[in-house]
C-alpha cells in the first residue's frame, strides 16, 4: 500500500538548538533546571552535577512541547539531552499500565542503540526500556514488548520487522527520537525511517539530532517536525 499523505508540520513548532553555547558552568548545575527531585537525585547519584550545553539547550523548548532539531556530534551528551525532558514528561503523566511504548528512539547502529538504552535506564531505572536490533532472536524482543515498555530503542530494520509481525504497536507513541539522522542515510535506512515515521501518530513530540544536514535530513525535518 502506498504511504498515506503526511502534511507538513508547522515550522513554528520546531526549535533549533546548538550543542554549545559557552554557558557559565555555575548556571549549568542540575539544581538550576526544572527537573523533578527523582531525576536530580538519579543524576547526582551518577556523578552528574552539571548539564552539557546540548542538554541545557534542549530542555527548555522540549518541556514546552516543541519539536527539537539539534546539530550534535557523537559524544556531546545528546542522549541525556532528549531523554531528560521525555522522562520528566512521562513521570508527570504517571505510571502507564498500557503495554504499548510511549517513546520510540531510532538509531543507525546496534552499538548506539544499546548505549542509549543503558543511558535511559541509568537515569530512571523504573522506566521500562527495551533495545531491539537484528542478528539476535526476535522472539525474546516480542515477549518483552508484550510485557510492556515505556521506551523502545532500536535500529530501523528490526523495528520494521516487529511492526510487520504485529508485535510493535506505534499508536500510543507520544515521543519520537531520530538520532544521528545523517548516519541513517549513510547506511541506507532512509526508507525504513520514513515508513516508521508515517506509522506514528501526528500528535507527538519529535527530536532529531544530526552532525550534518544533507538534503534528506532537511527534508525529513520539514516533513515530520
Q: Predicted regions: what is each one?
A:
Residues 14-18:
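Short, low-complexity intrinsically disordered segments enriched in A/P/G/S/L with frequent Arg
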Residues 19-20, 24:
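Intrinsic-disorder-associated, low-complexity terminal segments enriched in Asp/Asn/His/Tyr and depleted
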Residues 26-71:
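Conserved pre-motif I regulatory segment
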Residues 41, 96-164, 172-175, 218-219:
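Conserved nucleic-acid-binding Ia/Ib motif block in the N-terminal RecA-like helicase ATPase lobe
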Residues 43, 55, 70, 86, ...:
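Residue-level signature of catalytic and energy-coupling elements of molecular machines
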Residues 59-64, 80-97, 121-122:
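Walker A/P-loop NTP-binding motif
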Residues 72-76:
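The conserved Walker
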Residues 169-178, 182-225:
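Post-DEXD/H (motif II) to motif III coupling segment of the RecA-like Helicase ATP-binding lobe
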